[in-house]
UniProtKB/Swiss-Prot annotation:
<dbReference type="Pfam" id="PF08264">
    <property type="entry name" value="Anticodon_1"/>
</dbReference>
<dbReference type="GO" id="GO:0005829">
    <property type="term" value="C:cytosol"/>
</dbReference>
<dbReference type="InterPro" id="IPR002302">
    <property type="entry name" value="Leu-tRNA-ligase"/>
</dbReference>
<dbReference type="InterPro" id="IPR015413">
    <property type="entry name" value="Methionyl/Leucyl_tRNA_Synth"/>
</dbReference>
<feature type="short sequence motif" description="'KMSKS' region">
    <location>
        <begin position="619"/>
        <end position="623"/>
    </location>
</feature>
<keyword id="KW-0436">Ligase</keyword>
<dbReference type="GO" id="GO:0006429">
    <property type="term" value="P:leucyl-tRNA aminoacylation"/>
</dbReference>
<dbReference type="InterPro" id="IPR009080">
    <property type="entry name" value="tRNAsynth_Ia_anticodon-bd"/>
</dbReference>
<comment type="similarity">
    <text>Belongs to the class-I aminoacyl-tRNA synthetase family.</text>
</comment>
<keyword id="KW-0030">Aminoacyl-tRNA synthetase</keyword>
<dbReference type="GO" id="GO:0005524">
    <property type="term" value="F:ATP binding"/>
</dbReference>
<dbReference type="InterPro" id="IPR001412">
    <property type="entry name" value="aa-tRNA-synth_I_CS"/>
</dbReference>
<keyword id="KW-0067">ATP-binding</keyword>
<keyword id="KW-0547">Nucleotide-binding</keyword>
<dbReference type="Pfam" id="PF00133">
    <property type="entry name" value="tRNA-synt_1"/>
</dbReference>
<dbReference type="Pfam" id="PF09334">
    <property type="entry name" value="tRNA-synt_1g"/>
</dbReference>
<feature type="binding site">
    <location>
        <position position="622"/>
    </location>
    <ligand>
        <name>ATP</name>
    </ligand>
</feature>
Amino acid sequence: MQEQYRPEEIESKVQLHWDEKRTFEVTEDESKEKYYCLSMLPYPSGRLHMGHVRNYTIGDVIARYQHMLGKNVLQPIGWDAFGLPAEGAAVKHHTAPAPWTYDNIAYMKNQLKMLGFGYDWSRELATCTPEYYRWEQKFFTELYKKGLVYKKTSAVNWCPNDQTVLANEQVIDGCCWRCDTKVERKEIPQWFIKITAYADELLNDLDKLDHWPDTVKTMQRNWIGRSEGVEITFNVNDYDNTLTVYTTRPDTFMGCTYLAVAAGHPLAQKAAENNPELAAFIDECRNTKVAEAEMATMEKKGVDTGFKAVHPLTGEEIPVWAANFVLMEYGTGAVMAVPGHDQRDYEFASKYGLNIKPVILAADGSEPDLSQQALTEKGVLFNSGEFNGLDHEAAFNAIADKLTAMGVGERKVNYRLRDWGVSRQRYWGAPIPMVTLEDGTVMPTPDDQLPVILPEDVVMDGITSPIKADPEWAKTTVNGMPALRETDTFDTFMESSWYYARYTCPEYKEGMLDSEAANYWLPVDIYIGGIEHAIMHLLYFRFFHKLMRDAGMVNSDEPAKQLLCQGMVLADAFYYVGENGERNWVSPVDAIVERDEKGRIVKAKDAAGHELVYTGMSKMSKSKNNGIDPQVMVERYGADTVRLFMMFASPADMTLEWQESGVEGANRFLKRVWKLVYEHTAKGDVAALNVDALTEDQKALRRDVHKTIAKVTDDIGRRQTFNTAIAAIMELMNKLAKAPTDGEQDRALMQEALQAVVRMLNPFTPHICFTLWQELKGEGDIDNAPWPVADEKAMVEDSTLVVVQVNGKVRAKITVPVDATEEQVRERAGQEHLVAKYLDGVTVRKVIYVPGKLLNLVVG
């Protein structure tokens, strides 16, 4: 064994061994308990970043630990390979998205191998290959036949200059990112999957997910947004149709003083024919894309349509306004306004001088003061005719019942959740498998024409999708009749909604899933990824699992038993102000810093001498230029050091602050482990350990070893507090470094201890542990070695610490045998100099003894 720890020499050797031996390849084995450990698959952007490394290290630690417990562990990896960034990169680098993507996959695969992750590479998949997306296309056609897929027009961002649809992130300040033309809202036909048909189940089954973070479950509950209320129909004077609104507060209905409709509502369109002000307002609304998050903060605007609706209970005429806070795609595109008891309605009514009518009493029973704001709390009704004096629940039911009896109301359960629009007007995605015949009939692509293959040899102009630009691509025949293919592609969330299931049978040719394999491995035992995926991906992931269950492919209700959301990786961020006042962000690697005595950064400059402003720790990002390249760190310290730091620096679900000093600390620790094993093995063979012949000191050290095994096992297995597990191993290492190594049993004990340490560290730092296990003459490869088991007998304390007090003041702490009697403890206490001093010449009036803990002598 060489004396120095040289990761650059051992890591590549161990990785080659794993490759050649196919160590992590698994198949179904009914005789073994399975464990499916999955990290969210990466987008092949070109290089791994520290967020990836953290995510995949956590997964690898768990997978290796479970493997050492003797389970059949599946840990696969693949590539979420479709998506918009590839199109931009292809234009920039004068290539096509496919070669750019495949090059990135090859590069990043090497980076993953360099970090020593134990993946079953035989199951690797890339979602951009026809072998993968053909089954997604087939499944979509099945969903269409089941009535779970439909087409309807929906608003998109449209650049009139480029004649193309833009994603929300391509709209900068209302203009096209490429040509700066003002973006319009345009209605185009798009495909939707009926996720709303599963809304109740998606909501209710959250209660089954005991091992998912509450934050994620709450976000999904709010996103699904189930509410109970009443749908109310209003007659409108001089208008051919009625208006329907939905409210969750029918108790406030007698305070409804106006209605508001979306700018795109047919009533507003009709009114605009003779109202130029309204027409201009509708135009303005059409071209403002409003995300729901911005709705709350934006200025509320509206125009009176001139139409009057009739309040069904009071018979009063109330105005109908067009307002920018009502969205056509939500509900009916019309809302009832109760400005006395809804703050948004109140602000709008105050701005435009509309009637505000209070109908709910304040908590103290007085009439509410509406001079500053609405009263939004529930309470007792007044000013409401026959409903006066009713509380919220009674009023809700009474008004709902009356409206229902009159035929103008209906109790309804509503959802915030909208159906999933899966059409994208981009090129680099899976083609949607639908065709249109010459007579306008729309139908699914027949099975014998699947997959609909996306051509990869294309020229990107950065504007139009190549399959939209080439009229020949869309032409096909179905049942001998000419037809046109759909030129939209799937939302890339489609591919990531079912990949976890395809990993169980990536080569399966007969269908989407081999149910036997899928049901052996599924559900996933632990799924690891960022909390930013809480609603979109993790909701579609759950939805797809239920769709596959209802298609008879899987036999479970939920895709993953446990979800672990790892924290973000933060790093120092610095900038200097340029000549034009712009911020130039400087990589922390290039910052020369001065620190105070507490280690805080007080001054910084770069190599060019710019004074740098230090903005603290923030998420590693391109925009702040504060990402640290994992590859550079691995080349400098070795993969094991980077992995150990990642797991030690912070609990897995909290943010991690990147500190190179911490990385150096992790590296020093591994050097210490190496050195101790080197010194131990240099002394030659070791005798067998005889636990019955150990001295008190040897027993105490062995107790520490086995207590550490018990703690680390609990920390990794049950608590998943990996940082405290590592801390416990480090503490044990400090004791081992000071332990005597001269006697035969000293060395036998050291052998047992080091074999335990190396196995406990193996999930974190597998390369060094693989090597040290061989040096310690461990049986077989460490990859197949069992996890160490704590010896209960070794952990039993044979002595205990007793605190000795005289008149309640601590005078000594003594070590006594566990089974010592009170007399023996008193006798031993009397031998202590300080205790004897305070007992000299006085009478012991009372003795308080708590066995094994406390002896208090009361003297007078």
